[in-house]
Amino acid sequence: MIFSHGFGGTHIVGTQYAQALARQGYVVYCFDFCGGSPSSQSDGSTLEMSLFTEQEDLEAVIAMVQGLDYVDSDNLFLMGTNQGGAVSAITGAAHPQEIRGMVLLYPAFVMVDTANELFASAEEIPDSTYFLWMNVGRTYFEPLLNYDIYGAISAYERDVLILHGDADRVVPLSYSERAVEAYPSARLEVLPGAGHGFSGENAQSAIAMVLDYLAVHLQKE
């Protein structure tokens, strides 16, 4: 399982999931996106980061993980929260034969609408914008203008599990509901009362659903 953190996050976000899955015998790899946050342990500036540079980062991680002798490359799964969920979604769609399944937690498909609401054209985008809680560059917003993210993710035909709280005010539940319609085979599990980010009982419920999903979708020898 390769875990991708969200906007402004680090690999630390994946700790609770990685530990729970590792206790059940799974190999979990968490990493920092290049320029993913001011606290990133990877190289790069937040001004250079975008959905698509993060896709390149994830593709590099996939290639590296596939070369590890203790990893079963036939059972490679992607998991991501927030923007990391969106990155996982487009990356999985670009590599459908390599990725056995995906778990997307409150994936930020909203980012396309946000970019188009902020800027009517590429000419309006400044070199630096303070967005949410950090500075991002022109390269963050420009590729999202008129980007059909649902069309992109629909190329992934294997089973996808989406987990989303119905009290999420950062990424409304409706974006995951639309994703389920776009995917050929996806299931949406709604966590009542959960906001953006899972903790406590919500996190434990999410972990249980992830483990159930993996148990069903692992390719047995």
Q: Where are the language model's segments positioned?
A:
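Conserved alpha/beta-hydrolase
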Residues: A20-Q41
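Short alpha-helix in the alpha/beta-hydrolase fold that links the catalytic acid
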Residues: R158, P172-E181
